Amino acid sequence: MSISPVELLSWYDHARRDLPWRRPGVSAWQILVSEFMLQQTPVSRVEPIWSAWIERWPTASATAAAGPAEVLRAWGKLGYPRRAKRLHECAVVIASEYDDVVPRDVDTLLTLPGIGAYTARAVACFAYQASVPVVDTNVRRVVTRAVHGAADAPASTRDLDMVAALLPPDTTAPTFSAALMELGATVCTARSPRCGICPLSHCRWRSAGFPAGTVARRVQRYAGTDRQVRGKLLDVLRDSTTPVTRAQLDVVWLSDPAQRDRALDSLLVDGLVEQTADGRFALAGEGETGRPA
């Protein structure tokens, strides 16, 4: 069984969300920025930060010219701030080695900082209309249910081949990829699928009576984790115009000093924070100079 391009594309034509990075005139760089931000982060949180980012830094060279600390500030509370650092590094390479133009092919994209298998294919597909399979959790879920009749499936080395076999052999392949992703994000969701409005008339999971999944879902806890502590420490540094003392950081997490120290050490190791000669702390690039006026 396959997935009908006619059914899927007809649905996508009227049901797709009006996301800013999908609009006409959006550049390959701006699409790349959206892909960095959308990793493990809901669309609703990404939209305002992406829009502000693109208004401020519309090109790779503009992003590269900004200091890493300003990039971290603009990233705000999107989470996983190492993505911001890698995005800045990616901008530097594109500006200096590719004349400010995002590479078109997957193999070259894979050589850029912070770009893995998914992001490389997403940029090639959505920015340059390349007919390449793009597989995220939403796409994997739709294909697993509609084609294989299971509720879920773990990531597999066969995913790319499986999705590639579904792509229509014409210029609609990139739109088909976007539609698969949209269907998984808005209709064929993990917890509460809206099968009553699904455009796919042939779905093996539905035909099989919706068998339960076998893959245990991990519930990602945030409260009390090192991620939360790292975020609180970064908040202090983002809000400061000068390096701060250890005492100013200590007060953000008094309940577990060892965890706080571990979180701070990890920020230093990741290159997101630096320590000055007198023992104070600042965002990367602002240790000696402070925040630019």
Swiss-Prot record:
- UniProt xrefs under InterPro entries: DNA_glycosylase, Endonuclease3_FeS-loop_motif, HhH-GPD_domain, HhH_base_excis_C, HhH_motif, MIG/MutY
Cofactor or coenzyme needed = [4Fe-4S] cluster
Q: Name one GO molecular function term.
A: 8-oxo-7,8-dihydroguanine DNA N-glycosylase activity
State the reactions this protein catalyses. Hydrolyzes free adenine bases from 7,8-dihydro-8-oxoguanine:adenine mismatched double-stranded DNA, leaving an apurinic site
CC cofactor note: Binds 1 [4Fe-4S] cluster. The cluster does not appear to play a role in catalysis, but is probably involved in the proper positioning of the enzyme along the DNA strand.
Write out the GO biological process terms: base-excision repair; mismatch repair
Q: Which SUPFAM superfamilies match?
A: DNA-glycosylase
Question: Effect of knocking it out?
Answer: Loss of adenine glycosylase activity. No overall significant change in the mutation rate; an increase in C to A and A to C mutations (with a reduction in other mutations) is seen after rifampicin treatment. No change in susceptibility to H(2)O(2).
Q: What EC number(s) does its UniProt record assign? A: 3.2.2.31
Family listed: Belongs to the Nth/MutY family.
Annotated protein name in UniProt: Adenine DNA glycosylase
